[in-house]
Amino acid sequence: MDVSYNWLNEYVDHDWSPKELAERLTMAGLEVETVRPLGQSLDGVVVGKVTAVREHPNADRLVLCDVDLGDGAPSQIACGAPNVAAGQKVPVATVGTTLSRPDPDDPEALQELTVEARELRGEASNGMICAEDELGLSDDHAGIMVLDDDTPVGTPFPEYLDAHGMPSTDAVLDIELTPNRPDAASHLGVARDVSALADSELRTPTVDTPSPGGPVAEEITVDLRDEAGCPRYVALLVRGVDVTESPLWLRRRLTAIGLQPRNHVVDVTNFVLHECGQPLHAFDLDAIADDTIVVRRTDDETPFTTLDGEERDLPEDTLLICDAEAPVAVAGVMGGANSEVSADTTDVLIESAYFDPSTIRRTAKALDLQTDSSYRFERGVDRDGQVWAAARAAELIAKLGGGTVVPGLVDEHPSPPAEKTIALRPDRLTQVLGTEVPTDEGTRLLGAIGFDVEAGEDALHCTVPTWRPDVSIEEDLIEEVARLHGYDQIPEPERVPVPSRTPEQPPEETLERQARQLLKGLGYREIYTNSMLRTDRAERFNVPPAGSDRAPVVETKNPISEEMAALRPRLLPGALEVMQHNRNHGQEALRVFEFGRVFRRAAEPDDPIVPGYSEHPALLVALSGPHAPTGWDTEPRSADIFDLKGTVETLLDDLRVPALQVRPRDAGATDEAPPVTQHHIDVAAGDTPLGTVARVRDDVAADFDLDTPVFVAEFHWAALVDSATAEQHRDYEPVSRFPVVDRDLAVLVPADQPVGPLQRAIREAGAPLLRRVDVFDTYAGEGIDEDTKSVAFTLRFGADRTLTDEEVDARLDAIVERLAENHGARLRQQ
C-alpha cells in the first residue's frame, strides 16, 4: 500500500525524514518495503506575469509573450499553449533551470530538460512557461498552468506550492500490510500510529455528520435483503453537481499514490478511501430506477458490465447492489458501467457500506478482480466509519463542483455490534514483556491509537475501537503497547530463568511425538492436508473410523470456493490426493501418515464449545506400491494389508496399548454406504474400538489415478491415547533358567478362516505353559480338500521348572480340542 509522506503530514506533526519515518513504522509493525522520492526541487522556476501576447511572425502555432519575472525588463518567451493570455500569473522556468519528468517510453526513467536561451523561428526565447506535467505536478499537458492572480511576481515557485499545501517534492512509502491490520490501510490509519510514536496529536478532518432520516430518506429507498452480506448500508445525496476536473491539490494527492484522476466526483471517493480506509461508490442518481437501492444476491449466473468495460458472468450467490430493475454494482468490488458518473451527471448518490469480508473475498476471487475497495473490505473496514466517510465525500463533492448536500441520510444498520472491552493487567504486561512499562505510558499509547482506557483497581479497562477487529484478548493489547513502546526499548534479560524441572507435557503430545518418530523410522512420510474440501467429496468419504457414529457433513458458511465448502469427516481423501500427486511425479512406493482433526455434527446438541458440532484428533497411516526396492537378492512384491497390519501392531505395541485386539470384521459388516474401503480389520484395546485397517476400493483409488492397491489405517487418536495412558499392571517375568519345549502343529481350516482368531484360541487353551505362538506356513492345493487350507504353527512351552512330555501333550490336546470346537479345525495328518 502506497502512503504519501506529504499527505500523511497533514494529519500529524513529527520531525522525521521519509527514511526515518519508514524505520519507525517498520519497528512498530508496519513494514515499509521501499521509500520512493517524487517530484523535483524546481529551483529556478519563478512566478511570472504575462504582460503582453503577440503572434509569432514565422510560426502559426507559436506566440511571443512578454513576461515580467520581477527582475527588471520583461523577458520574451515563445509559447505554444492554447490558453496563454495577457494578465496571467504563470510558472516560468528561467534560463539554466533543469526540469525532469517520467519518460513516456519507460516510466521508471526520467527525461531531463535544461532551459536555454535560444531562437525559435528567428525570434529569441528566454525561458519556458510551464504546463503541469513539465513541472512534475500531474500528467496534464493541455495548456500552461495558470496561478492565482494575487501571487506576487518573482516568487520562487516552490514557495507558491508550499503556501498552497503542495510541496514540490514528496516521498511514497510502500507499506506491506499484514492481514491483521486493516486499520492501517489508509493515511489516517498510519497517521494514528505515527501520533503514538511521536507523541503528537492526530488531526482528523472535521466533518458535519448528519443524523439518519431527513429529506434524503424521503427521496432514497434502501432495501437491505442480505444483512449477513451487508450489515450496514449508508446513502447520502448531493444535487446540482457540476462534474468537473479536480483541483491540482487533489490530483497531486492521487497521482502520488499511483491513481489516475478522472473527475472531481470519482476523485473525491478515491481520496476519501485512501484518507480513512472506507471504500465509497458514487452513482448517477438518474441511472438508479425508482431512486431505490436493493442489496441482494444473484439467484443464478448473471451477465454484468463493470466500470472497466468488461462484461463478466457473475456466479450464483454474488452479492449485488441493484436498483428497482437491475444490478448497478458488484458489492464491495466494482461499480457498473450502467450507473457511472459522467460529465452529464447532476445528482450524485453516495454509497458507504460495510460488507462481510468473506463474501467480498469470495466474489473478488471468483471474478479474478482485485480493487482498492475489495482489498479493504476483504480485511475488514471500520464498522462505525460509514457515516463519517460519506459525509466527508459529500462535503468535498459539493465544495469542488457546486451542488447541495441533501440534509439527512439513509442508514440501514439492523444489528449494530456490541462494544468490546478488554482488561489489561499491568503485572501481566510486565510478565510478558520482561520489562516494566509505566501505566501512564501504556494508557497514552493505547489512547493515541483510539482505545478508550479507564483505570480500575487491578487493570486497565480498554474499550476497543471499531476499526480494530484484530484486537480481542489481553495479549493483543500487550502487543500494541510493545510495538508502540518499541521492541528495541525492551532490554535483553541478563539471565534467562530455567526451571529446575522440565514441565510435564500432556500425554497426547508425548505419544504423538513418539508415534511420529516410530512411523518415520518405518519409512513413512508425514503429510499435512487441507481440512476443507468439496461437499460431494466430503459426502463420499463421510464414514468415521470405528467407534464413531455416522453424522451429516459439516458445511462451511460463505466458503472461499466450492473446493473448500465442507470440513473433512476423515483424513482419507486428503491422503489420497497427496498419494496421487506423488504418483504423478514418479514416486512408486507410497508410505504416508498424518495427524489431523476431523469434523462432524456433535452427538449431543448442547455441545459446550460449538453447539451441534464437534471435532476430534485422528491418525491416518497409508501405503501403496512396492513393499521394498527391488534388489539382486530380493523378489519384487507389492505391499499388502498384512504389511500395514504389521505397522499398526508395531506402533500400538510401542505405545503400550493394553489388551490389543486386531481381528477381521465379519464379511458385509460395514457402516459405509456407499463403501470406500473393504477387507476391514478392526483394532481395539479390549472392548474399546480404536480404529480400522482396510483396503481402499479399487474404483475409489482409480478416481485418484492410483492403479496399485491402497491400504489405510485410521484411528480415533483420543481413544488410543486414553487406552495407552490407562493405569496398567505389569508383572515382571524373569528369563527362565529352564529349557523350553517347541512343538509344531498343523491344522486344516476353511479357506476363508483368518489366522488371528486361531492364534488367540491357541493362546487361551495353551495357558499357562504356552509362551509363544508363531505361524510358519500356510498351504492350499494338492492333497488338501477344496475350500480348505492348512495353517502350521510353532508353539513354545515353558515354566519355572523343567516340563515333562505329559504336561506339554496335555496342553496340545487342549489346543486341538479348542480349535475344533471354535473353528472346525482338524489336525493335518500329512
From Swiss-Prot:
Family annotation (NCBIfam families): pheT_bact
Residues annotated for Mg(2+) binding in this entry: 470, 476, 479-480
Quaternary data: Tetramer of two alpha and two beta subunits.
Reactions it catalyzes: tRNA(Phe) + L-phenylalanine + ATP = L-phenylalanyl-tRNA(Phe) + AMP + diphosphate + H(+)
Top-level division of the source organism's lineage: Bacteria
Domain B5, first and last residues per copy: 417-492
GO biological process: phenylalanyl-tRNA aminoacylation
Upper lineage: Bacteria, Pseudomonadati, Rhodothermota, Rhodothermia, Rhodothermales
Subcellular location: Cytoplasm
Protein's name according to its UniProt entry: Phenylalanine--tRNA ligase beta subunit
First-level EC class: ligase
One GO location term (cellular component): phenylalanine-tRNA ligase complex
Entries under PANTHER family matching the protein: PHENYLALANINE--TRNA LIGASE BETA SUBUNIT, PHENYLALANYL-TRNA SYNTHETASE BETA CHAIN AND LEUCINE-RICH REPEAT-CONTAINING PROTEIN 47
Residues of the tRNA-binding domain: 39-158
Major location category of this protein: cytoplasm
